[in-house]
Amino acid sequence: MSISIYEFFHYSLFLGLFVAFTYNKKQPPAFGAALAFWCILLSFLGLLFCHISNNLSNYNVLTANALFFYQISGTWSNHEGSILLWCWILNFYGFFFCYRGRPQSHNVLKQGGYRESLFFFFVLNFVKNSILSLLRYEQESGLKNQLYTPFVLRTLVDSELCSRRNRTFDGPALFYAPLYPERKIKNPLDAWRFRGSREGKRTHPLLHLARDDKERASSIDEQRIDGALGIALFFSFFLLASSDPFVRNFFVCTEPLAELNPVLQDPILAIHPPCIYAGDVASAEGFGLCRSKMMNGIVALHSPPMRKDAAEKNGTLLCSAGCVGSRITSELFTLKFKHVGAKCYPALLLRSNRSPLMLLRRRFFAFSSFWAGARSHSTKRY
């Protein structure tokens, strides 16, 4: 009977790998992450029970004889057990992350509210306030707006208005606003129908910053969660392929063949691997989020609607992503100035742009002094 229980713990690893392969993206991400988490948890508890009960049919238990406390720590004191602990912590973070910050399509409660995540609320609110402060700085300094098109400004204002009134439809209409500002959404019912259309799926990248507090707190989509689940899938496959912790003995033995490593028989070193893994594995979640966010941003910026909009308007996101030098040159050589008349002469043009000229001159002198210093250093050396 005990052999069947240990085999069940062993096969739960294969079940977790099967769930990761056959996960349906139409379902909530927390559903797939929960199944994988519980499967890995059963395997880890099964290996822990093997060490506690001193089951000598397991090879790892046969070579790790020690006291009861170190029998427990012997679960992760070898290569196979440490990889299993790594996979379990990774699936735990994925499950906790999906549960606390589920996407909008799966995060609606029966009361009509949304789950909030304090971390994402703080970060996105900080980014939004930074953008608004940059807007005030550009307005006070009189510089030309490079990032804030009328559509983006209207979106930021609408987000504040939407946060003050209750929604009567499923899902925020602001998030599914199209790239084309000339197409307006008349009522919430049209916005709900517009969600599933092909044009509604191409959203503006800056709309993530323009939603209200509850929407921005729960704005984790499936593609970003799949990046973290893919890392867990790799380690689960590696665990089953080369580091199986449930290897059984082909002979009967009544006493352990070896003791646990004396270096690991220390209270601090016994709890050291779980503490280290808890910090190291958490970085995998951040890596998955950043990777998927960068890929989504690249696809959005190079999409045909975005490139067409960038070619027509000088203040789009693509033009604002340039360096400071491109911004200075665009302000120096453009003919669209408020304080210059219809006949724009070069003298008036340079006079109305003295601050960019000063900045350009400072950078030129800094570069020339750096180049002269490098040449003098090379001549002294040779």
Curated annotation (Swiss-Prot):
Keywords: Cytochrome c-type biogenesis, Membrane, Mitochondrion, Mitochondrion inner membrane, Transmembrane, Transmembrane helix. Its main location: mitochondrion. One of its GO terms (cellular component) is mitochondrial inner membrane. It is a multi-pass membrane protein. The chain crosses the membrane at residues 1-21, 30-50, 79-99, 117-137. It is found in: Mitochondrion inner membrane. GO terms for molecular function: heme transmembrane transporter activity. One of its GO terms (biological process) is cytochrome complex assembly. A stretch of 270 kb of the mitochondrial genome is duplicated within the centromere of chromosome 2 resulting in the duplication of the gene. The expression of the duplicated gene (At2g07783) is not demonstrated. It is also probably not RNA edited and therefore differs in all the positions known to be edited. Interacts with CCMFN2 and CCMH. PANTHER family: CYTOCHROME C ASSEMBLY PROTEIN-RELATED, CYTOCHROME C-TYPE BIOGENESIS PROTEIN CCMF. Forms a complex with CCMFC, CCMFN2 and CCMH that performs the assembly of heme with c-type apocytochromes in mitochondria. Belongs to the CcmF/CycK/Ccl1/NrfE/CcsA family. This is Cytochrome c biogenesis CcmF N-terminal-like mitochondrial protein 1. The lineage of its organism: Eukaryota, Viridiplantae, Streptophyta, Embryophyta, Tracheophyta.
